[in-house]
């Protein structure tokens, strides 16, 4: 089932992950744990050769909270949108095709409290609908943002709930 949440730095593997054995270790050729088997890509519900594991360094960050509180609260911003591709950059008259255009901001989210703005209008060019406005994130804590995954990876690696972040 798609939860809508993506796992930054997820490891793709061909190791068999079937119902009942997720949560097991993913080992490298030296027998070292590099991840925790988590999910499969399947239309039948069984292993079809594509599995995914949470990296062990991510698990190390999360496990103490799970042991202590029984849950882990992920840092989040509260936005959805789209990466700036060359077509969108042209339409928005941007110099570079990089960054993340905010389409929606979740009410009450950190993004909402910070005053970030989502899209409020669209424009049609050559029969294709494009966003006409909305804030564009081009950096996070002085690191360049080329796409949403740059933001998600930064949140996962560097931030905890309640931490400030400069966009």
Briefly describe each language-model feature range:
Residues 1-23, 29-74:
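Active-site loop architecture of trypsin-fold serine endopeptidases
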Residues 15, 28-29, 33, 58-167:
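C-terminal recognition in membrane/secretory proteostasis and scaffolding
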């Amino acid at each position: 089932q798609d939860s809508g949440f993506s796992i930054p730095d997820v490891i793709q593997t061909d190791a068999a992950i079937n119902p009942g054995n997720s949560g097991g270790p993913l080992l490298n050729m030296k027998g070292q744990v590099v991840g925790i088997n988590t999910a499969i890509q399947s239309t039948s519900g069984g292993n079809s050769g594509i599995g995914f594991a949470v990296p062990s360094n991510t698990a190390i960050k999360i496990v103490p909270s799970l042991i202590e509180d029984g849950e882990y609260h992920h840092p989040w911003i509260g936005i959805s949108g789209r990466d700036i591709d060359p077509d969108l950059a042209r339409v928005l008259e941007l110099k570079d095709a990089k960054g993340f255009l905010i389409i929606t901001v979740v009410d009450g989210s950190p993004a909402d409290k910070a005053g970030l703005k989502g899209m409020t209008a669209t424009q049609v060019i050559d029969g294709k609908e494009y966003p006409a406005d909305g804030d564009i994130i081009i950096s996070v804590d002085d690191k360049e943002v080329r796409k949403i995954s740059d933001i998600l990876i930064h949140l996962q690696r560097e931030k905890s709930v309640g931490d400030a972040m400069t966009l």
